Amino acid sequence: MTHIKEIVVVSGKGGTGKTSLTGALSSLFRDKVIADCDVDAANLHMILQPEEVLQTKEFTGGKKARIDPDRCTKCGICREVCHYDAISEDFVVDTVSCEGCGACYFLCPAKAVNFSTRLAGYCYVCSTSGNGRFVFAELLPGEENSGKLVAMVRNETRTEAEKTGSNLILIDGPPGIGCPVISSITGTHLAVVVTEPTPTGIHDLKRIVELAHHFQIKAALVINKSDINPQYVQEMKQYCEEKGLIYLGEIPYETQITEAQKEAKAILDFAPECVASRAIREIYTKLQSILEEL
Amino acid sequence: MRDTNIAFASGKGGTGKTTVAVNLAYFLAYSQQQVQYLDCDVEEPNGHIFLKPEMDLKTPAKLMVPVIDQKKCTFCGECSAHCQFNALVTLPKNVLLFPELCHGCGLCVRICPENAITEGEREIGYIENGRAIHGIEFIHGVLNVGEPMAGPLIQEVKRQYKKQYVRIIDAPPGTSCPVVKTIADADAVVMVTEPTPFGLHDLKIAVSVAKNLGKPIGVAINRQNGEFPPLVTYLLKNNLPVIMVLPENREIARHYSMGNILLQTLPIYIDQFMELAVNIGRLLGKTKCRW
């Protein structure tokens, strides 16, 4: 079971084309399980259009404190011990500020604090037509612990891969470099970074590559919308060489991609012969040979 | 519009939050308003790329972390049993701390029966202050690479609020706790979206986050290229006002890719931002402030 390889698609900056690329690669790779780890704003299911939800699992998030006014003696200890200023002068807990540390709960002399978990999201294992198993999740709006839900998605995905005898897991990651991203990339074999040739693109690219290297994960680069600014493409290729990244290729700006998005279709199905689709097939071929060496 | 917090969120990444926020800040500052720009996307802060502030202060952001006196420790396990974040593990002759899991709540310090734990600090990133074009006060937080605790750094950025200013707050993408922390004290939230099924899907989640917090919401549509009927239907049904529309335009993309403030190099879009400012004023009228 250790022969399962995991590839994660990340970007640092949002909106560079992670999901479009993952969606396209999903229809090219055989024998794989696909995971959407962007649990805040999952989109891949809109392209893959799962046939059937095989399993729905509830995700319980962290605990939150609530003060029972009937038992509260207004002694003020909770306000004193709370590092997050989450308790008001009239002893009401602000659930936005509450981190769920339990300090007020454990230290309240009147035992007036309730401290319980609540439903924070769902994780779905699905079947798709032609794309194999697909796992994604929905964090309830505004909830915490997205990193933990990502871990749940990844566990379910591994279980599915073992069950179905798949040797590849393809993960669509969240934007950023924080908690859910760390949870998405740790233990993977390759991070495919999708960037765009803009100053924000290169700024965020450097931070996500640093993150991958911090966790000793090999990184590969795809430059999307590559013809917007050739100067940055050059700079990115140079950066790639300096940092020893694998250069997977570039996808030119293609209006068909926007059209495909509007219909929530993978670009390879929508316009199989457009320049972007051809570029993605080349990237896929390179990925295949890299996979053999991983 | 003084002393107001205007937050920019989106759900989906890359819809143009920073572009809209930066240009509104520019427009307001150009119109003689006192503007503070706070970049709360601490994982990937980008506002400085366009506003190019001259930074004059860099402060490390720290989070409390326990320091365990192994001599006093009896390895009773109380600290690790109480820690909600699994940041402490008690072994027979040692207590291990996983600093990146620690939320700095200080419960272990208070719960230890031997008083063997004291409060230390660790760096999670830094805050930079500077001044940008037309006197815009600029602040951003930059999270250390490998550090998962974005929340406390966002709080740190928000401690820098300047009174009497219009505060433009750029939120991170997504719909979970960092976004909630960022928009929690906003007087109005501008949702920047794009007219695609993905943009709309994520917009709906972001709107419900802001609605749960009771915020007035306006929607800015970026990269509009003909009407996207499902978006129009959703906005109408939920009574959400469209407060700005920017067209899909290669020139805008090109200027963005050069790191330009749009209004500086493509001033023809000034009408859109004037309209945005007026519409935000209307949104605020529903709460506490007026122009």
Predicted segments — roles?
Chain A
Residues 39-41, 176, 198-200, 226-230, ...:
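Conserved nucleotide-binding/hydrolysis micro-motifs of P-loop NTPases
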Residues 77-94, 103-119:
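Iron-sulfur cluster-binding cysteine motifs and their immediate structural context
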Residues 42-61, 126:
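P-loop NTPase switch/communication element
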Residues 180-199:
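Inter-motif core of Ras-like GTPase G domains
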Residues 1, 211-294:
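C-terminal lobe/tail of nucleotide-utilizing enzymes
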Residues 139-141, 145, 154-180:
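Switch II (G3) loop of P-loop NTPases
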Residues 32-45, 117-122:
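Short beta-strand-centered segment that lines the nucleotide-binding/catalytic pocket of NTP-utilizing
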Residues 2-29:
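Walker A (P-loop) phosphate-binding motif
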